[in-house]
């Protein structure tokens, strides 16, 4: 794949990569980390600069094994508030229902965290970089054109 950036850009991505990941949120950064760890040449492109504002994030216990596999459990714990369940409240607040993760989920995964999304995303993004992904911030991808040679990416920085 050959990323071709806008001529007015001040920074260019690697001229060739195995995988281009567009979007430096949780999914994109996680995928970039895993692929870079496998030795793939990865370029991770994010239209903003981290840390950046996003709504959320309420993590679930099923996320914990992934954080462990990435080697990020302690970093996520450091930026998060422990959460052992969820409470559902009716619109008029007449009914409440609390569910403990250990009772409703896998009892080996009794908790997760509530995190500030900007911090969470930055931890994952910087981890992808530490795993070997080339990261490009402030880069808006406008077009990806595929041909027999691979793909050309047009972006603005």
Regions found by a protein language model. Name each.
Residues 28-29:
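N-terminal Rossmann-fold NAD(P) dinucleotide-binding loop
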Residues 11-25, 43:
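Beta1/beta-strand and adjacent pyrophosphate-binding region of the FAD-binding site
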Residues 36-55:
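Glycine-rich FAD pyrophosphate-binding loop
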Residues 1-13:
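Basic/polar N-terminal segments that are highly enriched at the extreme N-terminus
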Residues 40, 72, 133:
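Short phosphate-binding/catalytic loops that engage adenosine nucleotides
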Residues 52-93:
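N-terminal FAD cofactor-binding segment of flavoenzymes
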Residues 16, 90-157:
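Conserved N-terminal helical subregion
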């Amino acid at each position: 794949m050959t990323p071709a950036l806008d001529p007015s850009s001040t920074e260019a991505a690697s001229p060739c990569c195995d995988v281009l990941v567009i979007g430096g949120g949780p999914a994109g950064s996680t995928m970039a980390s895993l692929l870079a760890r496998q030795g793939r040449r990865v370029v991770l492109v994010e239209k903003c600069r981290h840390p950046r504002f996003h709504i959320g994030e309420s993590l679930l216990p099923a996320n914990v094994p992934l954080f462990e596999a990435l080697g990020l459990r302690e970093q996520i714990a450091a930026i998060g508030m422990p959460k052992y369940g969820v409470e559902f409240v009716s619109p008029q607040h007449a009914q409440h229902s609390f569910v403990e993760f250990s009772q409703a989920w896998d009892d080996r995964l009794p908790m997760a965290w509530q995190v500030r999304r900007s911090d969470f995303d930055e931890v994952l993004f910087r981890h992808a970089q530490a795993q070997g992904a080339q990261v490009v911030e402030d880069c808006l991808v406008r077009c990806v054109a595929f041909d027999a040679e691979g793909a050309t990416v047009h972006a603005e920085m």
